[in-house]
Amino acid sequence: MKNNIITLTQSLIQRPSISPDDQGCQQLIAERLQAVGFKLEWLPFGDTLNLWATHGEGKCIAFAGHTDVVPIGNESQWTYLPFEARIVENMLYGRGAADMKGALAAMVIAAETFVKHLPNHQGKIALLITSDEEAAATNGTVKVVETLIKRNEKIDYCVVGEPSSATQFGDIIKNGRRGSITGNLYIQGVQGHVAYPHLADNPVHNALKFLDELTHYQWDKGNEFFPPTSLQIANIHAGTGSNNVIPGELYVQFNLRYCTEVTDEIIKTKVTEMLEKHKLTYRIDWNLSGKPFLTPQGKLVNATLEAVEKFTQIRPHLDTGGGTSDARFIATMGAEVVEFGPLNQTIHKVNECVNIDDLAKCGEIYYHILEKLFNEQ
């Protein structure tokens, strides 16, 4: 499988698929899958292309990934051209090499090879591929999941090929993620001259005690799977830029990464209580990016642990840290979900790269997961 994985990865990297422009990546994948009998369904939404490819019937094991990449930044800082896909000393360089065209290629080749060997396999193998993960993530996996739910089509197990490894390939499997919710808070005051404060009402001064309470509040203590919920102020703005004008409004944007000990409703209620307690005039808009999810040790987690250990000779650690991913959408279907892929040390950076031996092992691991899960059905 190694040569096929590397060749496909290079072909994908050579297509400059800056989110959400797929640039023909999914068509390349679709042709391979169709050649071995996969049924293809194109699910475009807005400016996003999505592919749902399936083979077989029964319990569904899905591989999920994205063809889109982040912008390259300053091209002159790259040692090798970002869309050239050059291999130097066993490292494949290019935007998307690690996040996540390499793992995507490994998934495709693993599924293709499995179907060639076992065309009448048990269950259903699926690939869910989107071009909208790195940017808005509004017309990609979330829309495909909504479509599948509407027609009662189920995903039982899902492996997302995000680059989960931290310091050594295979050291981490993600079996959950924290939730993410953002508050956009507008606190009203009365604008005026700084020399006449009695004729104005400074929203910055009024909000200080509230902000102190908000940033020091302990939401929970976490649990055995998640660290404690954390809140960070991301942006804050008030005033006109002049030193003699009391601002009429204060804008505060804050984000919480929250564990399973709280819910988004608990968070909203508590923040509202604080605002009312401090008698502020305000408007708050909430944006829920994703709810927390956890896949406990069971068939998928155990199969992934076994496969990674077999091909890396290390025992991976189960982890729920980091940001959000498309796994959060798939988890809403009741699926067991894990994320596993190459090292994440160079993702989104200049000179993004991946070890080609790691990609080959990725393919072997994904193949072994298929074998293990189908044998247990």
Curated annotation (Swiss-Prot):
One of its GO terms (molecular function) is zinc ion binding. It catalyses: N-succinyl-(2S,6S)-2,6-diaminopimelate + H2O = (2S,6S)-2,6-diaminopimelate + succinate. Keywords: Amino-acid biosynthesis, Cobalt, Diaminopimelate biosynthesis, Hydrolase, Lysine biosynthesis, Metal-binding, Zinc. Binds 2 Zn(2+) or Co(2+) ions per subunit. The active site is at D68, E133 (proton acceptor). Its cofactor is Zn(2+); Co(2+). Its EC number is 3.5.1.18. One of its GO terms (biological process) is L-arginine biosynthetic process. Pathway: Amino-acid biosynthesis; L-lysine biosynthesis via DAP pathway; LL-2,6-diaminopimelate from (S)-tetrahydrodipicolinate (succinylase route): step 3/3. Belongs to the peptidase M20A family. DapE subfamily. This is Succinyl-diaminopimelate desuccinylase.
